[in-house]
Amino acid sequence: MRFSKMHGLGNDFVIIDSITQKVYFNSDKIRSLSNRFYGIGFDQLLVVEPPYDPNIDFHCRIYNADGSEVYQCGNGIRCVARFVCIKKLTNKQHIKISTDTYSMMLSVLDSEFISVNMGEPIFDPIKIPFFSTQYQKMYVLFVPNFTILCGVVSIGNPHCVILVEQVDLVPVTVLGSILENHHCFPKKANISFMQIISQNNIKLRVYERGSGETKACGSAACAAVAIGIQQGLLKKNISVQVNLPGGDLFISWKGLGYPLYMIGSATYIYDGCINL
């Protein structure tokens, strides 16, 4: 099986073209491949398929390192756009890619940066999904030894965003692993810890559902900016710089009724071949 290794700000992916080769995976095989000592190693596996809709260019299936399938990955989708250009699967500058729940328009800006229309953020708790009797801008979650005040939103996948004073001091792995599996999130959630630097700049650390803390997460950056704007902490209509451990993303949102836009890099590392 041929594959490519890529990363978006250190959030690393194995990308597989299933258009020109036949591939099959189960969760055990994905977990084996994701192992950084005995496999290839990756945060997520991205499988590029032919489109199921004539108005779409490519379909993408997304698997976490634990073998679970998810339906959104902002950093991964940028890498897929770069991948299909590198592999000459398209010559388009504007590429529409679908997942099982979402479709996104991506624009190749130059040899490094990709712009993504991430769609509208969803705050309705039923659609996130999040167990709550009513919509609120902020929710309280109780976990052992902590009371957490957070915002929740879907960017095609569920996100929980927690405002903190010093993000570098947060026990991300401890809190993230507890909150990811909180009973209020029936499909689990990505957990983000956001520090406001200014109205157009934040620092962010992310515990990704099924993967643990990662260097960067595009949909989490979008979720954090959406929550920040919703709370009046960040400005609308400008590019908000999101500082992640792996690098920076730039997110803009006009407000309710409008899509989020993300700009970030997508970096090719190498090609390889492995026997399954």
Swiss-Prot record:
Disulfide bonds: none annotated. Pathway: Amino-acid biosynthesis; L-lysine biosynthesis via DAP pathway; DL-2,6-diaminopimelate from LL-2,6-diaminopimelate: step 1/1. Substrate binds at N11, Q44, N64, G74, N75, N157, N190, E208, R209, G218, S219. Its EC number is 5.1.1.7. PROSITE patterns: DAP_EPIMERASE. It comes from the Bacteria. One of its GO terms (cellular component) is cytosol. The active site is at C73 (proton donor), C217 (proton acceptor). GO terms for biological process: lysine biosynthetic process via diaminopimelate. InterPro entries: DAP_epimerase_AS, DAP_epimerase_DapF. SUPFAM superfamilies: Diaminopimelate epimerase-like. It catalyses: (2S,6S)-2,6-diaminopimelate = meso-2,6-diaminopimelate. Keywords: Amino-acid biosynthesis, Cytoplasm, Isomerase, Lysine biosynthesis. It is found in: Cytoplasm. Belongs to the diaminopimelate epimerase family. This is Diaminopimelate epimerase.
